[in-house]
């Protein structure tokens, strides 16, 4: 039975990852950590939780020594658009936190996961069916952090034998937590606005294709990768992942199947648009499929139904 410590547990991915891991491995076997306490009624209250600033190595050591995990899932990070507003802080948090977590994994012989991103690619990367191994010259601080992180994970595996594993996540779409500073967040916000207001003003331009995936598929991919036979993992430092390549008009049309009067217009944010323009339109996920069986279950249509149903349910519950 795995015993897992998760950093950044209150983030978009972390929240749902903690819930899934506790379901699989037991509430008491998953330590959730973040820089602040979870809200009252949070799903994270059903198991151990500790305050952790990932830039504080001594505190991280203390928690590992007391909880004695065999696995670290390092999810704490500043996202792409937020990182551009404060690049020095982004470097300190994203790289300092990762170095601390990797050192802990080395010192205590932990299996290690941290996510990379399609943000690790840049304008000179092939934009269509982007290969697993290709040019990576990102133009955002977040992307620079992710490329450095991929290389560090490979270094710690080759130099110290740390069982590091990672994936390049596309935009992740979830109804559990609302958007939090990412370039792909329009594809989450659009569903909430469709239910609440019947219209949405997109900060990403029409015909801007980006890879996306439903959060349930993303969480299952993490678990599947961490359970996979390490001998078969050739590209362990960061597997390309995606379930769909979409642009705002496609999401609008999917929503209009359920909300025929839904309206979409555009108020493009130049910062986030420039980041999106530097990313691929679609990526090749064949290595993840071949090496550990990646198989996402949700396409745009199936995801849209789940998103709208879940948000409608939340809205009705809040009215009561």
UniProtKB/Swiss-Prot annotation:
It comes from the Bacteria. One of its GO terms (molecular function) is L-threonine 3-dehydrogenase activity. Pfam families: Epimerase (PF01370). One of its GO terms (biological process) is threonine catabolic process. SUPFAM superfamilies: NAD(P)-binding Rossmann-fold domains. Belongs to the NAD(P)-dependent epimerase/dehydratase family. This is Uncharacterized epimerase/dehydratase SSP2164. It comes from Staphylococcus saprophyticus subsp. saprophyticus (strain ATCC 15305 / DSM 20229 / NCIMB 8711 / NCTC 7292 / S-41).
């Amino acid at each position: 039975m795995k015993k897992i410590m998760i950093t950044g547990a209150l983030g978009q991915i972390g929240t749902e990852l903690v819930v899934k891991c506790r379901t699989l491995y037991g509430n008491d076997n998953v330590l959730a950590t973040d820089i602040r306490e979870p809200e009252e009624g949070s799903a994270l209250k059903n198991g151990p939780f500790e305050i952790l600033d990932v830039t504080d190595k001594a505190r991280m050591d203390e928690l590992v020594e007391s909880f004695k995990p065999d696995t670290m899932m390092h999810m704490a990070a500043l996202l792409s658009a937020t990182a551009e507003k404060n690049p020095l802080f982004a470097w300190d948090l994203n790289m300092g936190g990762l170095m601390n977590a990797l050192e802990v994994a080395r010192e205590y012989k932990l299996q290690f996961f941290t996510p990379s991103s399609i943000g690790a690619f840049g304008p000179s990367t092939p934009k269509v069916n982007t290969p697993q191994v290709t040019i990576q010259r990102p133009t955002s601080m977040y992307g620079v952090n992710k490329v450095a992180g991929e290389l560090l994970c490979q270094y710690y595996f080759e130099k110290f034998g740390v069982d590091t594993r990672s994936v390049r996540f596309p935009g992740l779409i979830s109804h559990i937590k609302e958007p939090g500073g990412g370039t792909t967040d329009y594809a989450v916000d659009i569903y909430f606005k469709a239910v609440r207001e019947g219209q949405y003003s997109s900060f990403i331009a029409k015909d801007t294709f980006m890879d996306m995936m439903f959060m349930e598929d993303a969480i299952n991919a993490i678990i599947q990768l961490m359970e996979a036979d390490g001998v078969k993992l050739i590209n362990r430092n960061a597997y390309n992942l995606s379930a769909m390549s979409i642009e705002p008009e496609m999401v609008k049309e999917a929503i209009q199947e359920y909300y025929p009067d839904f309206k979409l217009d555009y108020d493009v944010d130049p910062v986030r648009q420039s980041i999106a323009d530097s990313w691929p339109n679609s990526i090749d996920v064949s290595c993840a499929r071949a090496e550990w069986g990646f198989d996402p279950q949700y396409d745009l249509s199936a995801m849209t139904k789940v998103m709208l149903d879940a948000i409608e349910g939340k809205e009705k519950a809040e009215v009561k």
